[in-house]
């Protein structure tokens, strides 16, 4: 099983005050138990680290680096993927869409991944299945 991990899921796992913290923790543990391949881009990782530091402090960053990064397969964004993400962002023309999400969509299509661990409606709008359902 291969699952693409979004920033929204990683932040929900970390933050006990997040409205979806419990389902996020449960799914995270289930994916680890199944030894699922957990994939994200370096852009997702940078976004997650920046938001975690801003919202929860350096201790959250340390937790990510120590406990989460080792179980992730980080796909480094290639130049062509970056620009494909920019083109997708511009073609969608939505102010609340992010470049990080668009690059995630490009990578998911390239890798043939249909499921995303995400609490972000943009993934479903792009035709992906969000976990948890």
What are these regions (language model features)?
Residues 1-39, 53-66:
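Short, well-structured N-terminal submotif of metal-dependent ribonuclease cores
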Residues 2-6, 40-41, 97-98, 120, ...:
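Histidine- and aromatic-rich ligand-binding microenvironments
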Residues 7, 28, 45, 65, ...:
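Alpha-helical structural signal
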Residues 34-38, 71-73, 112-114:
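Short active-site oxyanion
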Residues 48, 66-79, 86, 92-94, ...:
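Short acidic, glycine/proline-enriched helix-loop-strand junctions
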Residues 74-115:
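Active-site neighborhoods of divalent-metal-dependent phosphate/nucleic-acid chemistry enzymes
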Residues 105, 110-133:
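Acidic, PIN/NYN-like endoribonuclease modules and their adjacent C-terminal/linker elements
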